[in-house]
Amino acid sequence: MTDKVRNRVQCWPALAQESSCVDFIPARQGATCGSTVVFIPCCGLTRGRRVLCQWFPCLSGGCCSQESSCVDFIPARQGATCGSTVVFIPCCGLTRGRRVLCQWFPCLSGGCCSQHTVNIIGEPPRPVGAPSFEFVEFGRLPSILSTELKLFQRAPVPEDFGIYYEGNADIARQRWTGGEAKALELLGRRLKQEEEAFREGYYLPTQARPDFLAPPSSMSAALRFGCLSVRMFYWCVHDLFARVQANNQLKHPGGHHITGQLIWREYFYTMSVHNPHYAVMELNPICLNIPWYEAKDDSLDRWKEGRTGFPLIDAAMRQLMAEGWLHHILRNITATFLTRGGLWISWEAGVQHFLKYLLDADWSVCAGNWMWVSSSAFEKLLDSSSCTSPVALARRLDPKGEYVKRYLPELEKFPALYVHEPWKAPPELQEQYGCVIGKDYPAPMVNLAEVNKCNANKMNAIRQKLLDQGGSTPAHCRPSDMDEVRQFFWLPEDVAAES
């Protein structure tokens, strides 16, 4: 480090007062080898830039070609943490220097991470108490007015609005009941599940140990329709964690990650504000314009109807139609298969299908998840190399094929050896099991190994084109690291390796 640079760092006490996510300001537009890049923690970029301009006239439009050419970063103080002032001087391009810098600032490896944002914003308010209706008098409309307004004399059902059931009632196992009373009852069961997990030293039990056969314990539908306060759910889980820690003298790390999915929910809400094109690709400022395949055959219909020839995918899609529900992991694997991990069909088609049939469908959250899964947004780097194989995932999470057989009764006689790859069963056994592949159940519609390789090449070409043009993914918050991605996708090392 030169004395010149060291002295300059000591002249920035004002910058140490800034807070919030870390950003960088290049010494000039199109900064190249040898230019200065100043990393500052900026709550308001305008103020940060104004302060910097007092020390760097080049930021106001001048040129800073005389700066040192060494590759280095200088923290404003020793032991700098996320949010510290850093001077970054690349001589070999931003990539190498950024890699060095990320050792100090993990959030920079994928943009400003949501966990860091949450730490700055602080805890959400606690829920207010239930209102009292003791002295409230409710009026009643005259019957003639009720008739004139065409009010329902009972709670309406979907059929009253011309919406009719399209699934297979014979395989439907889960019926949902709305209302606050049922939501609080489900919350009580969910908290017992959370408590068991905390005692055993883990969290997010529905993801850490997913059970596709058990009754859903997710609170998403109750949150979606306002039957349960999201603040109540958040604080119930965190207060429970604190009690378990204290009562059992445990020292497991806590923090916002124990309710990580709620954080992503709020984050997707934030990203959709003032963006009417959030659920489509065109005119969406945070979405990459990927040239997806325009399906003119029946590929999209086969995916929707559960006729892809891959049992886990088909079972999930039929469960969706029958029950209006899918486990988070199944949503990800079916979405991946439709987009970058299989059919290369636009995520927009998937969003519309999920919004129509998912009971807990939420425009902001649903579209946000689809953009992420398809690598269209919220990605550190366009990638199709880590697509989980539906066959490998099925073997791990449904080893006996019980889930698959529940929603694909045509495969109920297939043993565990063949149930996830029924096309591998010898023809005579298929006859014996009463299900001939290609006749009673479809053969795989694609060769997974081939399409994964092809799709990975497409993504790599798109990424390289962006880099060649000096571009990058749209500016938005992304996962901090691979651990956060794995937690979101439930992507174990061994499953990824088999992909």
UniProtKB/Swiss-Prot annotation:
Molecular function (Gene Ontology), one example: FAD binding
Record's cofactor remark: Binds 1 FAD per subunit.
GO biological process: circadian regulation of gene expression; entrainment of circadian clock by photoperiod; negative regulation of DNA-templated transcription; nucleobase-containing compound metabolic process; regulation of circadian rhythm; response to stress
InterPro entries per the UniProt record, alphabetical: Crypto/Photolyase_FAD-like_sf, Cryptochr/Photolyase_FAD-bd, Cryptochrome/DNA_photolyase_1, DNA_photolyase_1_CS_C
Main location: cytoplasm
Gene3D superfamilies recorded: 1.25.40.80, DNA Cyclobutane Dipyrimidine Photolyase, subunit A, domain 3 (1.10.579.10)
Cellular localisation: Cytoplasm; Cytoplasm, Perinuclear region; Nucleus
Cofactor annotation: FAD
Highest taxon listed in the record's lineage: Eukaryota
GO terms under cellular component: cytoplasm; nucleus; perinuclear region of cytoplasm
Residues that, per the record, bind FAD: 190, 218, 220, 261, 328, 360-362, 366, 369
Pfam families in UniProt: FAD_binding_7
Keywords assigned: Biological rhythms, Chromophore, Cytoplasm, FAD, Flavoprotein, Nucleotide-binding, Nucleus, Photoreceptor protein, Receptor, Repressor, Sensory transduction, Transcription, Transcription regulation
Family to which this protein belongs: Belongs to the DNA photolyase class-1 family.
Function of the protein: Blue light-dependent regulator that is the input of the circadian feedback loop. Has no photolyase activity for cyclobutane pyrimidine dimers or 6-4 photoproducts. Regulation of expression by light suggests a role in photoreception for locomotor activity rhythms. Functions, together with per, as a transcriptional repressor required for the oscillation of peripheral circadian clocks and for the correct specification of clock cells. Genes directly activated by the transcription factors Clock (Clk) and cycle (cyc) are repressed by cry.
Domain notes: DNA photolyase domain is sufficient for light detection and phototransduction.
Subunit structure: Interacts with tim and per; promoted by light conditions.
PANTHER family hit by this protein: CRYPTOCHROME, CRYPTOCHROME-1
Protein name per its UniProtKB record: Cryptochrome-1
Lineage: Eukaryota, Metazoa, Ecdysozoa, Arthropoda, Hexapoda
